[in-house]
UniProtKB/Swiss-Prot annotation:
This is Adenosylmethionine-8-amino-7-oxononanoate aminotransferase. One of its GO terms (molecular function) is pyridoxal phosphate binding. The keyword Transferase applies. Belongs to the class-III pyridoxal-phosphate-dependent aminotransferase family. BioA subfamily. NCBIfam families: bioA. Residues 509-542 are annotated as: Disordered. Homodimer.
Length: 542
């Protein structure tokens, strides 16, 4: 048994007061439990030949949603007892609900939207593609948009990544990389059949398929599936605010990388891949790696002959300030996983880029069976690839990365005063990716109790004020579209600041507690789930 200290569990301007003007966004239980009445009212309006008013339409949609839709990462008991925001339209960097309320999209629709909603160039590219073909399989056929996109992606990716394997989500991009690394070593002339294991990191999140969940290091999300999963070599990821070894970043000499080196010495001969989120572990609460850590990991992979898989699903396409996060440390991975922002946030598409060396390991005669027997029905979908090509056009024509730099600097300036708030423990940021960790006591870094649901309440309070954000436990995540203006940045940060003050200093709940026909006024206090220590950063908001 190792005695390494890293074996311990990692614990996971205007209107900045509690009386700020808010949207009239109610949170009671009536609409979600009267499906028949709401649907009947809608039918009666239809029968009378008059359109239902916006309120009736919203009530009907909420009722249907509560009756039929199972939302991801959402406790449906809470959801069905609320009146959720139903998004009906969008415009630029704003979302619009069925009642006509506008909300600034502060998390780019779960980290996907790049250039704003309804960008005319991307809209038109999809319309043009619709006039040709919406989808055609890549099994045995080529497709114009997927061919053009592969050429564009390899041209902008780190040098040496020459081949593109398409899929449809971040999870499947990582899953493909896992199977490629494993199969390569089972069949390639230069492969090593002993290399059957994968190194992954604490607090990692790589998706929701069984392979990607096996890599995950978040017990709240992944623990229950333990019997289904393979066992990776688990290495410590940097967590400077809550270092499990109780070290300080200015004096530790990157001890966590030293622990990775120790594990590599012991397990390197059996590893086919190391999978890492470069620069930032997003779903862990925007945990930022110290400068040089990623470069050091690349060097260790080279030394031990292990493929480095860079999961840039969350950080790719400009969110860290460069097209790809790896660029910031001069790192070229052996495989690069892309999704989310690849289509500008329009349509599901993913890609796994690999080197020519890896691709060559799958070449052989028909009877050699070195084929990569893997793929998805909608792989390389024509509409999605057309959107991705148009998004890359916008990057070039609008000089997105160049014009983003002053707004990144402005974001840093706007965030600085939040360090003075008594319940802000840590602010972590790379590019526009920002995590604001809220704590009960900043001196001791004591987290809030899970049943207080501080991050959830701040999110709802911000929504009442017209801004959409989504927490990771008690870490408030800001990740706006790259098209956000300086004025909108000010609105985003000032609104979140006001919501934090309202909740942590004045007790606002954002309309969280609701009177339910089948339960107490505050169901969370009556029915608080057991949350594993160190997993609180996994809690998300309905």
């Amino acid at each position: 048994m190792s005695t390494s200290p890293f074996n311990s569990r990692v614990a996971p301007m205007p209107h900045d007061d509690a009386t700020a003007p808010v949207l009239h966004y109610a949170h009671d239980a009536a609409g979600a439990h009267d499906a028949a009445d709401a649907a009947g009212a809608h039918d009666a309006a239809d029968a009378a030949g008059t359109p239902p008013c916006a309120a009736s339409r919203t009530a009907r949609l909420r009722s249907l949603d509560a009756a039929h839709v199972w939302h991801p990462f959402t406790q449906m008991r809470d959801w069905m007892g609320s009146e959720p925001c139903i998004i009906d339209a969008a415009d630029g960097n704003h979302l619009i609900d069925t009642d006509g309320n506008r909300y600034l999209d502060g998390v780019s629709s779960l980290w996907t939207n790049v250039h704003g909603h309804r960008h005319p160039h991307i809209d038109e590219a999809i319309r043009r593609q619709l006039d040709r073909v919406a989808h055609s399989t890549l099994l045995g056929l080529g497709g114009t948009p997927s061919i053009e996109l592969a050429a564009r992606l390899t041209a902008i990716a780190p040098a040496g990544l020459t081949r593109v394997f398409y899929s449809d989500s971040g999870s499947t991009a990582v899953e493909a990389a896992l199977k490629i690394a494993f199969q390569y070593h089972r069949q390639a002339p230069e492969g090593d059949a002993r290399r059957t294991r994968v190194m992954a990191f604490s607090n990692a999140y790589h998706g929701d398929t069984i392979g990607s969940v096996s890599l995950g290091g978040m017990s709240l999300f992944h623990g229950i599936y333990g019997p289904l999963l393979f066992d990776p070599v688990r290495a410590p990821a940097p967590h400077c605010y809550r270092c499990p070894a109780d070290l300080r970043p200015e004096t530790c000499g990157m001890a966590c990388l030293g622990e990775v080196e120790r594990l590599m010495r012991h397990h390197g001969h059996e590893l086919c891949a190391v999978v890492v989120e470069p620069l930032v572990q997003g779903a862990a609460g925007m945990l930022v790696q110290p400068r040089g850590w990623l470069r050091g990991l690349r060097d260790l992979c080279d030394r031990h002959g292990v493929f480095m898989v860079a999961d840039e699903v969350a950080v790719g396409f400009g969110k860290t300030g460069t097209m790809f996060a790896c660029e910031q440390e001069g790192v070229v991975p052996d495989m690069l996983c892309l999704a989310k922002g690849i289509t500008g946030g329009y349509l599901p598409l993913a890609a796994t880029l690999v080197t020519e060396h890896i691709h060559d390991g799958f070449l052989g005669g028909y009877a050699d069976f070195r084929t990569f027997f893997h793929g998805h029905t909608y792989t390389g979908n024509a509409l999605a690839c057309a959107a991705a090509l148009a998004s890359l056009d916008v990057f070039e024509e609008e000089r997105t990365l160049e014009t983003l730099r002053p707004r990144i600097e402005r974001l840093a300036t706007l965030l600085a005063p939040l360090n003075d708030l008594p319940h802000v423990g840590d602010i972590r940021r790379v590019g526009v990716m920002t995590g604001i960790e809220l704590v009960a006591d900043r001196e001791t870094r004591t987290p809030y109790r899970p049943e207080e649901r501080i991050g959830h309440r701040v999110t709802l309070e911000a929504r009442r004020r017209g801004v959409i954000v989504r927490p990771l436990g008690d870490v408030m995540v800001l990740m706006p579209p790259l098209s956000i203006t300086e004025t909108e940045l000010e609105t985003l940060v000032h609104t979140v600041r006001g919501a934090i003050i309202a909740v942590t200093e004045h007790g606002a709940d954002g309309g969280l507690w609701t009177k339910r026909p089948d339960g107490p006024d505050n169901p969370d206090k009556a029915n608080t789930p057991d949350t594993p220590d160190g997993a609180r950063t996994g809690e998300t908001v309905v």
